[in-house]
Curated annotation (Swiss-Prot):
Protein function: Thiol-specific peroxidase that catalyzes the reduction of hydrogen peroxide and organic hydroperoxides to water and alcohols, respectively. Plays a role in cell protection against oxidative stress by detoxifying peroxides.
Domain of life of the native organism: Bacteria
Lineage: Bacteria, Pseudomonadati, Chlorobiota, Chlorobiia, Chlorobiales
Predominant cellular place of this UniProt entry's protein: cytoplasm
Protein name, as recorded: Peroxiredoxin
Family, similarity comment: Belongs to the peroxiredoxin family. Prx6 subfamily.
Binding site for substrate: R119
Catalytic center residues: C44
Species annotation: Chlorobaculum tepidum (strain ATCC 49652 / DSM 12025 / NBRC 103806 / TLS) (Chlorobium tepidum)
GO function term, MF aspect, one: thioredoxin peroxidase activity
Annotated Gene3D superfamilies: Antioxidant, Horf6, Chain A, domain2, Glutaredoxin
Length: 211
């Protein structure tokens, strides 16, 4: 199972958009690979619609979506057709037809529940590194806005060398400010409060993102 900071495992897969190499075909782009237990199930259907409703928001931040389950491609295709015909939502992102080997490699098989994959989420960066891993039980649908927020804050943290507070940009303590990494020596700690940051103490300083 890939851990944070690992290279995402090289996978050659079949999808509803044709063959794909993951993460090779995604290099240079952020991506969210999310698994679902099975096609033609209610919670999964609501999740796919919710992801599709946010495709443009993910694209705007340079992030691609890829679905996955242990179902065959023809099942994925038929399910996508059903969603279009009955819910008037056109699923535009690819869906991987995984097998047990791939699912086990990613740690996505639910113990005691056969070949149904758990609701896993992997966020990969443009270098193919695993940056975030989430697992949800079969009974609970995911919060797509939180996944979108997580990708955004990872990008901001990388670009600005800052840490992001809880619930950013709506943190109750520091609102939309970002956190300055704590000083790592005594001299820097002394200087920290002299710099133009808002500080509760030398180890807890924050600032506006654009400052």
């Amino acid at each position: 199972m890939p851990l944070l900071g690992d290279d995402f495992p090289e996978l050659k897969v079949q999808t509803t958009h044709g063959p794909m190499n993951i993460p090779g075909d995604l290099k240079g782009s952020w991506f969210v690979l999310f698994s679902h237990p099975a096609d033609f199930t209610p919670v999964c259907t609501t999740e796919f619609v919710a992801f599709q409703q946010r495709v443009e928001a993910f694209e705007k931040i340079g992030c691609k979506l890829i679905g996955m389950s242990v179902d065959q491609v023809f099942s994925h295709i038929k399910w996508v057709e059903w969603i279009k015909e009955n819910l008037d939502v056109d699923i535009t992102f690819p869906i991987v037809a995984a097998n047990d080997r791939i699912a086990n490699k990613l740690g996505m098989l639910h113990p005691g529940k056969g070949t149904n994959t758990v609701r896993a989420v992997f966020v990969g960066d443009p270098n193919g590194k695993v940056r975030l891993v989430l697992y949800y039980p079969q009974e609970i649908g995911r919060n797509m806005d939180e996944i979108l927020r997580a990708v955004k804050v990872l990008q901001i943290s990388d670009s600005n060398k800052v840490a992001m507070p809880a619930d950013w940009p709506n943190n109750l303590l520091i609102k939309d400010h970002v956190i300055i990494p704590p000083a790592n020596n005594v001299e820097d700690a002394k200087k920290r409060k002299e710099q133009q940051y808002d500080c509760y103490d030398w180890w807890f300083c924050h600032k506006p993102l654009d400052k």
